[in-house]
Swiss-Prot record:
The keyword Transferase applies. This is tRNA-specific 2-thiouridylase MnmA. Belongs to the MnmA/TRMU family. ATP binds at G12, M13, S14, G15, G16, V17, D18, S19, M38, G127. It comes from Ectopseudomonas mendocina (strain ymp).
Amino acid sequence: MQAPSTQRVIVGMSGGVDSSVSALLLMEQGYQVEGLFMKNWDEDDGTEYCTAMDDLADAQAVCDRIGIKLHTANFAAEYWDNVFEHFLAEYKAGRTPNPDILCNREIKFKAFLDYALSLGADLIATGHYVRRRDIDGRTELLKGLDPNKDQSYFLHAVGGEQIAKTLFPVGELEKPQVRAIAEKYELATAKKKDSTGICFIGERRFSDFLKQYLPAQPGDIETTEGQVIGRHHGLMYHTIGQRQGLGIGGLKDASDDPWYVLRKDLTRNVLIVGQGNEHPWLFSRALLASDIYWVNPVDLSTPRRLTAKVRYRQSDQACTLEKTENGYRAVFDEPQRAVTPGQSVVFYDGEVCLGGGVIETAQAWYEDAR
């Protein structure tokens, strides 16, 4: 294995504290470190929703502080073609996609990695809270040490070959430790708030953003019995398990329990709702997934006992995974709430992230009980 002092590493600098500390730690470990700030969205309305200029200034301040060069690259065209158009297509089809997962696969671990290698880098590094392990000729993706910050869910579609060319310096740390290091070295990002939400939406209301690209198609809101109790502005604005923004209230003979989105009937353009956080239609026993990406090849010649997450920050859920003619079927030991088509299911074997795919359909718990 090459000594760090002979290896050139380019760190993806986002202007946040995690990538800042990643660059600092790699320097301390003896690597030849440079930074790269990538711009993935071109603001066309003059209001700088993505705060790209502020983030670039913060990244530059950190690089100046620790004495490394900062490259810049614009991957907006790649982002539009490989992430954003898919994002719109999924919403148009009535599903709820996760663009961060595609961004990691197509931009950070493809466009950025390729560009860094073209600059002469041996490796790249990011501020993700994950770890890697080289074992038996392959590179595994492991959960980050901090369970509150583990980001393996978002990196499940990145292949082992890409993981093998990446360092994750903060994956072995907990978030408070990272902030403490940034403060100790007086980095400009030490107290910077973590970014939330999707870059290209920024602080705008999601519905306002989506209206710019997709025409709204209003339709009926129905109960599970087929009673029309309201109107929706477009199925794309709603997701399974949603409670807020339905505009339902004051119905005769209805209880005071809150209403939740249970289903989206795409054929009829109808939103199906029900009352109560424990409504049986909210819970699923099994799901079918497609577009599966494995970090490394996985043997599913027979059903396999694993754990899974159907959303970020969910605790590990025991399941049995099997390959079928129609995709991959996961059957859970316990009912899963608000399993959402378009979102990702990610599979684990202990601390190893095996990979995952897109949820196509969910089998309701009550259907299984019949």
